[in-house]
Each structure stands twice: as structure tokens, then as C-alpha cells.
Curated annotation (Swiss-Prot):
Entry-linked InterPro entries: bZIP, bZIP_sf, TGA_domain
PANTHER family: TRANSCRIPTION FACTOR TGA5, TRANSCRIPTION FACTOR TGA9
Limits of the bZIP domain: 44-107
Organism expressing this protein natively: Arabidopsis thaliana
Region Basic motif, annotated ranges: 46-66
UniProt-recorded name of the protein: Transcription factor TGA5
Lineage of producing organism: Eukaryota, Viridiplantae, Streptophyta, Embryophyta, Tracheophyta
Family label: Belongs to the bZIP family.
PROSITE patterns for the chain: BZIP, BZIP_BASIC, DOG1
Bias kind Basic and acidic residues: ranges: 35-47
CC terms in the record's Gene Ontology section: nucleus
Tissues in which the UniProt entry reports expression: Predominantly expressed in roots.
Annotated SUPFAM superfamilies: Leucine zipper domain
């Protein structure tokens, strides 16, 4: 019995130390596990935030793509609608509203329709001139050249038809020359070129002419000059008549009697402005007749060269306008 107690005591102390060691190790393990869990939790939160941000960015990207596709579709529909309106304008001589429920030929719409038509006409003319130039360079026969020359004259007839329709809706747009380049506007006369100046250009480019051709061209130039002078005088008279009409009566008074007089003056002035369309039409007829007379007086090959000379002169005016607009400004 005496030997039993000490052994029991030693065993208890050993167990206690062992338990304490296990407790310490367990405590340390729990602490390390908590720290690892917190670190892992922080990483999980960052990952979740990053995933959420990626999802939001993807959602916004899809929305932007959807909006872009919708914008493209809207632009396509508007372009189709505009093409349909212009087609109706060509057929009817008016510009149709996008709603389609009523026709109108307001000044702004008429001018826009004409500008589109004129650009298309110019593109077609450029193609004709390239074809004509190529035919001349390749020494095409007179019969082949005649077909192209007649096509160019017919194309000018189409231009004056387009201008006639435009004059009905906005004659001032044609008179102002805003559909031309700045340099071209410097030489503008009643919505176009002067026939007499055109003939001077042609005569200088086609020398030598026969004696009879020179005489005929000179006579045509003189008759064109006389017609231009008559139209210019008519425009001067119209401007003076408009000024007299608008300045007649008492200015600045607002009595009922003067209001009636004012409305009467406006009605008279509107009637006189209506004659502007006639001036444009006569000037364009003169221009067309000049082309037609020119090709009758010249040989087929001379006519082809004359049409090219006029076209190249116009191209140089446009090039001059581009250089002028692009010049350095101090």
C-alpha cells in the first residue's frame, strides 16, 4: 500500500502536463483556424464583389449593345423613309411629310428635296463626262459620240425640269444659289450660268472654227446677250415695283384702316413675287436652247469637246471653292 501512492501521484502529474499541452495545442489550433477563416472570409467577400462588378459590367455592356443595335435600326428606318419620301417628291413635285397623312411643299422641304435631286444629277453627269472623255481619247466614231452627246443634252433637260419643280416650292433657294459652291455663286445669274459667257468659253476652247461656225456662234452669243439683258431689265423692274408697293401708304401706323391697306399691299407684293418663277423658267429655257443650238452648229466631235470644256470649267470652280474654304485664317 505504501508504494502505491507515489506512483499514482506521478501518473496524475504526467496526465495533467499532457492535458495542458493538448489544451495549449488545441487552443493554438483554434486561433489559427479562426484567423484562416477570417482571411478566407475576406477573400470570399472580395471575390463576391468582383463577381458582382463583372455581372454589372456585363449587364451594362448588353444594354449598350442593345441600344446601339436599336439606333442602327432606327437609322435604317429613317433612311428608308427618306428615300420613299424623295421618290414621291420626284413623282409629284412636292415633298411628303413623314407621317404620310398630308402633302406639303414648304420652302425648307422643297429646297432639301431639290438639293438631293441636284446631287444625284451631278453624280450622273460626272459619269457621263467620264464616258465622253474616254470615247474621245479612244477615237470613237461620230455615231458613238453622238449617242453620248445627245444623252448629255437630255440630262440637262432633266436638270431644268427638276429646277422648274423646285421653283414652285422655293424660288428664292434657286435664286440664292445656296445649292452651288461659293465660287460658282459669284457667276450666278437667275439661278444658273449666263449663256453668252458659256459661248465665249466654248469659242475659245474650240479654235480654229470655220468661218461660218465663227459667224453662227457670234450671232448666237449676241442673241443670248440680248435675251439676258431683257430678263435682267425685267428683274430690275420687278424689284423697283416691289419697293414701290411696300413703301406706299403710311408706315408704322396700326389703325384698322391702315391694317387693311397693309394687307392689300402684301397681297399685291405676293402677286408680283409670283412672277419670279417665270424669270427662272425663261432663264433656264435660254440655257437649254443655247446647248441645243450649240450642238447643231458644231460637228459631233466639236460638240463633245465643248461639253467637256464646260464640265471641266465647272470642276475648276468647285475646286477653287474647296481651296478657298480650306485656306488658313489668321
Amino acid at each position: 500500500m505504501g508504494d502505491t501512492s507515489p506512483r499514482t501521484s506521478v501518473s496524475t502529474d504526467g496526465d495533467t502536463d499532457h492535458n495542458n499541452l493538448m489544451f495549449d495545442e488545441g487552443h493554438l489550433g483554434i486561433g489559427a483556424s479562426d484567423s484562416s477563416d477570417r482571411s478566407k472570409s475576406k477573400m470570399d467577400q472580395k471575390t463576391l464583389r468582383r463577381l458582382a462588378q463583372n455581372r454589372e459590367a456585363a449587364r451594362k455592356s448588353r444594354l449598350r449593345k442593345k441600344a446601339y443595335v436599336q439606333q442602327l435600326e432606327n437609322s435604317r428606318l429613317k433612311l428608308t423613309q427618306l428615300e420613299q419620301e424623295l421618290q414621291r417628291a420626284r413623282q409629284q413635285g412636292v415633298f411628303i411629310s413623314s407621317s404620310g397623312d398630308q402633302a406639303h411643299s414648304t420652302a425648307g422641304d422643297g429646297a432639301m428635296a431639290f438639293d438631293v435631286e441636284y446631287r444625284r444629277w451631278q453624280e450622273d453627269k460626272n459619269r457621263q463626262m467620264k464616258e465622253l472623255s474616254s470615247a474621245i481619247d479612244s477615237h470613237a466614231t461620230d455615231s458613238e459620240l453622238r449617242i453620248i452627246v445627245d444623252g448629255v443634252i437630255a440630262h440637262y433637260e432633266e436638270l431644268y425640269r427638276i429646277k422648274g419643280n423646285a421653283a414652285k416650292s422655293d424660288v428664292f433657294h434657286l435664286l440664292s444659289g445656296m445649292w452651288k459652291t461659293p465660287a460658282e455663286r459669284c457667276f450666278l445669274w437667275l439661278g444658273g450660268f449666263r449663256s453668252s459667257e458659256l459661248l465665249k468659253l466654248i469659242a475659245s476652247q474650240l479654235e480654229p472654227l470655220t468661218e461660218q461656225q465663227s459667224l453662227d456662234i457670234n450671232n448666237l452669243q449676241q442673241s443670248s446677250q440680248q435675251a439676258e439683258d431683257a430678263l435682267s431689265q425685267g428683274m430690275d423692274n420687278l424689284q423697283q415695283s416691289l419697293a414701290d408697293t411696300l413703301s406706299s401708304g403710311t408706315l408704322g401706323s396700326s389703325s384698322s384702316g391702315n391694317v387693311a391697306s397693309y394687307m392689300g399691299q402684301m397681297a399685291m407684293a405676293m402677286g408680283k413675287l409670283g412672277t419670279l418663277e417665270g424669270f427662272i423658267r425663261q432663264a433656264d429655257n435660254l440655257r437649254l436652247q443655247t446647248y441645243q443650238q450649240m450642238v447643231r452648229l458644231l460637228t459631233t466631235r466639236q460638240s463633245a469637246r465643248a461639253l467637256l470644256a464646260v464640265h471641266n470649267y465647272t470642276l475648276r470652280l468647285r475646286a477653287l471653292s474647296s481651296l478657298w474654304l480650306a485656306r488658313p485664317r489668321e
